[in-house]
């Protein structure tokens, strides 16, 4: 990846750490190739594979249709405990938002059918793949249904007045919050047949299509921390009583999270 461009290919589908499957669209009349890394097998120092959190290509054309933001790296994992007072980040180079814990859903436009489609990590068509009979899979379907209820009109995404205003050249990544069931737009990517280009939040949050969506689509709360060291950042997160923050690089879109110390124990 260079300067916010993610070049993506089906060629990685044979790697052991990748899950590859053929999925259908909502109407059942088109197929997709979906690539998603298996978090139990992937090595997270492999930046190339980390890009394939959930990527959708047309089948059999192999053209990129949808890109999901790569998994967020926990910044604390890179900090030596003895260096917690040393500078680890330059705030002016990042956009800082509240961390939203929830289910990620990706909205994209299929150029073959001229219809909007919905993808989650392991499936398309607005349905969750039930993996290993885990209860979390059933919970995920609930949040998919919440997404549809908020954006569909008369049961159809294509009739939604909000979606009608969206650029069809982009894919949109939402998180349906586990805490308040609100729908947050967390990432936008310009889609080309070969690559996805990162769009800054400071840009898309001011697009006209999002001017009158209050209460339907939310943006994560913005923070302006001057803190540079891990010790100071963690104190800021604790002081604001939030789950954590996400630092997004303004240059290439790479994301790092800093979680509140009680986040993993509550």
Which residues does each PLM region occupy?
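Core nucleotide-handling region used for phosphoryl-transfer chemistry
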Residues: 1-266
């Amino acid at each position: 990846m260079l300067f916010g461009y993610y070049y993506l290919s089906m060629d990685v589908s044979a790697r052991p750490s990748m899950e590859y499957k053929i999925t259908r669209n909502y109407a059942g009349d088109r197929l997709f190739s979906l690539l998603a890394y298996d978090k139990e097998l992937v090595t997270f120092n492999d930046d190339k594979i980390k890009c394939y959190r959930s990527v959708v290509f047309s089948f059999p054309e192999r053209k990129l249709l949808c890109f999901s933001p790569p998994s967020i790296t926990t910044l604390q994992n890179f900090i030596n405990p003895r260096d917690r007072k040393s500078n680890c980040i330059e705030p002016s180079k990042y956009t800082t938002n509240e961390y939203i814990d929830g289910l990620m859903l990706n909205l994209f436009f299929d150029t073959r059918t001229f219809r909007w489609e919905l993808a989650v990590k392991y499936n398309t068509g607005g349905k969750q793949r039930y993996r290993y009979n885990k209860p979390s899979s059933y919970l995920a379907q609930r949040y998919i249904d919440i997404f549809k209820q908020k954006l569909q009109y008369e049961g159809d995404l294509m009739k939604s007045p909000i979606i009608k205003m969206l650029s069809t050249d982009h894919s949109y990544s939402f998180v349906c919050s586990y805490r308040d069931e609100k729908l947050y737009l967390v990432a936008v990517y310009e889609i080309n047949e070969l690559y996805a280009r990162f769009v800054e939040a400071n840009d898309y949050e001011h697009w006209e299509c999002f001017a009158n969506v209050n209460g339907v689509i939310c943006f994560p709360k913005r923070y302006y921390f001057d803190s540079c060291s891990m010790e100071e950042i963690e104190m800021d997160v604790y002081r604001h009583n939030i789950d954590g923050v996400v630092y997004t690089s303004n240059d290439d879109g790479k994301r790092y999270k800093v979680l509140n110390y009680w986040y993993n124990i509550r």
